[in-house]
Regions:
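Compositionally biased, charge-rich terminal segments
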Residues: 1-17, 79
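Soluble catalytic domains of membrane acyltransferases
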Residues: 15, 23, 31-168
Length: 168
């Protein structure tokens, strides 16, 4: 977990540059493949920490979520993604960190608060995992817990049509 922790306090200049390059490529590809339209972008804080809480239907949701702001977005991902070395390295370099699903992963919650305390925004999918269909599934309370602990707002985000672009 040391590699993950090294990226929590703002990340290195290389990590930030890597994020910017990858984000721009992914957002460009999303714009080419989809009809991305961001509504009420002005409601996303230009500075300070906040939690971006999108609905999760597809693997394309994370890059789409980063389209709402040019700021670096930090995120959690299922820990199994970090077990594949190159994937885990890339996710960590992009500002991600693992969460053990199915348990109350206190370390991941502490990392969330640390990211927010450092002033960076954080993407948390309140449904916990990718779901199917247009209905919003029951939400886990992790995003609300972290928001209260860190004293930051939650910005809800709806993403329509991503399941058609990249099905579960």
């Amino acid at each position: 977990m040391a590699d993950v922790d090294s990226h929590l306090a703002g990340g290195s200049l290389v990590s930030r540059g890597f994020y910017s390059i990858v984000r721009n490529i992914l957002v460009f590809l999303c714009l080419v493949v989809t009809r991305v339209r961001v509504v009420d972008r002005h409601k996303v804080p230009a500075s300070g920490a906040f939690i971006l809480a999108p609905i999760h239907r597809s693997n394309i949701d994370s890059p789409l979520a980063s389209a709402v702001t040019r700021r670096r977005m930090r995120f959690m991902g299922k820990d199994s993604l970090w077990k594949v070395r190159p994937v885990g390295w890339v996710l960590s370099a992009l500002g991600g960190f693992p969460v053990s699903r199915g348990t109350a992963d206190r370390e991941a919650l502490k990392r969330c608060v640390a990211v927010l305390d450092s002033g960076e925004p954080l993407v948390l999918f309140p449904e916990g995992t990718r779901q199917s269909g247009p209905k919003v599934h029951p939400l886990f309370d992790g995003a609300a817990y972290v928001a209260v602990k860190a004293g930051v707002p939650i910005i809800p985000v709806g993403i329509g049509g991503s399941e058609r672009v990249m099905p579960k």
